[in-house]
Amino acid sequence: MLKDLFSKKKKYATIPSEQAKQDVPEGIMTKCPKCKKIMYTKELVKNLRVCISCGYHHPMSAPERIGCLLDEGTFQEYDRHLLSKNPLEFPQYMEKIEEDREKTKLNEAVVTGEGTINGFPVVIAVMDSRFRMGSMGSVVGEKIARAIERAMEKSVPFIIFTASGGARMQEGVLSLMQMAKTSAALKLFSEQGGLIISVMTHPTTGGVSASFASLGDYNFAEPGALIGFAGRRVIEQTVREELPDDFQTAEFLLKHGQLDAVIPRHELKDTLTNVLDIHQSRGGDEWHTN
């Protein structure tokens, strides 16, 4: 009996059942990746997907961003009918495209169109990282180039919101061509006096960061956005140096003169309105960057 009294008792861990795991429906709550706070998704969306605890800027979908920036009922979408093909016959590429179309209810990784911001007419392009990580394929480049051309025709400012992992590898050189095509369209627009505003959001990397994302008359970014061409690990291995902790963040780029401002999401519409107001000519119909 004494032996039983001093013997170690076995410890057991309780494993939650599948039913217990499903008690909280998916999508009801969102955990902040920065401060780890768990909040109601509905409250997060109401706060423009900015964490109410630490201010972390969660990604926004293209429809959400358009909805919070443009005046209600003014948005008219361009080129929704343009769809990606598979020119290189890359295995399972079209299956993945179809999956993203079903998941996001979008046809491609960018939404373009026209509308007004506090009464100021603009042409806008908004990338959506949910669709193939916002990668730039031939349709993405074509939609952006066409949007720039429409901004030229209408003599209104062009605003682009970037969120991309870079060029779309499944389309090879056709994807890389979009860097030149979009950059050339922006150059022509700029030569005609057009106003270009670029807003880089998390993440803006690869061929997108090396082309149209960095060619604005104003280059803005959201707080904490990852912005860069090559990955941090690749750069460290190449230069054989340890990089700063904040390397490739919006704040790092601002500090080193590569951005004009880092603007919190709640202040973005007012900032864009002020910029548009400054650049509108006295006549009210023309825009200029001079």
UniProtKB/Swiss-Prot annotation:
UniProt record, GO biological process: fatty acid biosynthetic process; malonyl-CoA biosynthetic process
Q: Which Pfam families match?
A: Carboxyl_trans, Zn_ribbon_ACC
Q: Where are the zinc fingers (C4-type)?
A: 32-54
**Pathway terms, separated by semicolons:** Lipid metabolism; malonyl-CoA biosynthesis; malonyl-CoA from acetyl-CoA: step 1/1
What cofactor does this chain's UniProt record say it requires?
A: Zn(2+)
State its Enzyme Commission number(s): 2.1.3.15
Intracellular or extracellular location(s): Cytoplasm
Positions that bind Zn(2+): C32, C35, C51, C54
Residue span, CoA carboxyltransferase N-terminal domain = 28-290
InterPro entries linked to this entry: AcCoA_carboxyl_beta, Acetyl_CoA_COase_Trfase_b_su, ClpP/crotonase-like_dom_sf, COA_CT_N, Znf-ACC
Domain of life, source organism: Bacteria
Q: Which Gene3D superfamilies match?
A: 2-enoyl-CoA Hydratase, Chain A, domain 1
Could you tell me what reaction this enzyme catalyses?
Answer: N(6)-carboxybiotinyl-L-lysyl-[protein] + acetyl-CoA = N(6)-biotinyl-L-lysyl-[protein] + malonyl-CoA
Task: Please describe the quaternary structure of this protein.
Answer: Acetyl-CoA carboxylase is a heterohexamer composed of biotin carboxyl carrier protein (AccB), biotin carboxylase (AccC) and two subunits each of ACCase subunit alpha (AccA) and ACCase subunit beta (AccD).
What is stated as this protein's family in its record? Belongs to the AccD/PCCB family.
NCBIfam families annotated for this entry?
accD (TIGR00515)
Q: What is this protein called?
A: Acetyl-coenzyme A carboxylase carboxyl transferase subunit beta
